[in-house]
Amino acid sequence: EVYFRLFSYVRYLNQRNIDPSYTDSFGVERSVQQRQDIQLAKFFSPFAGWFLTPKFRYYLYVWSSNASQGDPAQVVGAGNLSYVFNRFVTVGAGITSLPTVRSTEGQFPYWLGVDGRLIADEFFRGSYTNGVWIKGDLFQKLKYNAMFATNLSILGVSASQIDNKMDTQSFALQWLPTTGEFGLWGTFGDYDYHEKVATRAAVHWSHSLEDKQSQPGTNAIENSQIRLTDGNVIFTPDLFGKGTTVNTVDYKMMSVDGGVKYKGLSLEGEAYWRRLTNFTGVNTGGIADITDTGYQLQSSGMAIKDVLQLYLSGSQIFGRYGDSSEVRVGESWYFTKQRGLRLNTEFIHVNHSPVGYTAYPMPVGANGNIIHVNLEMNF
């Protein structure tokens, strides 16, 4: 059996109202690119199904981030193979998203906005990587996922760059106490229009010993660099002082999320905690452990059932090297009264973003107002 999907969107992006520069926590002034462009931003085509027996599954795809043309991993061919023993146990191997936060549980692209996480989610999460995993139901309304992997983000990273320790682990527990589900693929928002109150609560715990050689490029697709809260990549030479170079760092991260949906309305939140320890490298003995926290909150409502969704979202990040925040207001017009086509408009007011790359609606250091309009196709 073969199942073919196609996802793509055209994006108009206007960053002209953000500041042209910012000063990081070390007093260094850095320039910020103020983009205004139209891009066929992404092309995603998965092939999925089973072979010989419905228990043996494959999920293979081609993924292109056209805003990142010329950058590492602008085009990716990836996927995974799995075997379903029963509803309690599925074992898989290959490339998939680490279950570090809710948005990497596999519901992409069913988010409130188009292909753009809030800055807190983007800052703390892991990404796509090679590994093995086991997942399934512990009980009827309690699901688990455990993955053992090579690093936090493999896309754009050669096998010759990663270490030989397989020292990345990520675990997730998801509880769906009322209805036993939370919409199609666990999507954000309530386009499904639940007639009964749907609820969820989940916890994620992840650990990785990260090496500077195994980090993706700063504009690699699905970039997941380890950054300080001022936006600096932690492996930058001389960042903590002249002659200082971090080679490895221990990353520990936990997130807790919960949400409720009812008749087109949704309220969903997530809290994050990250700790960076055990720095190794040249002159790293004086670097103290780093703890950062943050949260995001997303609310939405179907103003017109099946047609118009409105949403209001926000997030904050708190850390020794600076705090960040944002507010987003948006709408999605499903002009065919189906989920497969929508016209999305989103306004972002951001204060000192510590994350950003070409495929993301804002650059590192963004401070000000951003608007983007997206025509999304997903079938």
Question: Where do the protein language model's features map onto the residues?
Answer:
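Outer membrane beta-barrel
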Residues: V2-S21, R30-I154, Q161-G180, Y191, ...
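Outer-membrane beta-barrel pore domains
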Residues: N17, V32, Y193-F379
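Acidic surface patches and DE-rich sequence motifs
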Residues: D24
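Flexible, glycine-rich linker and terminal segments associated
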Residues: G180-Y193, M377-F379
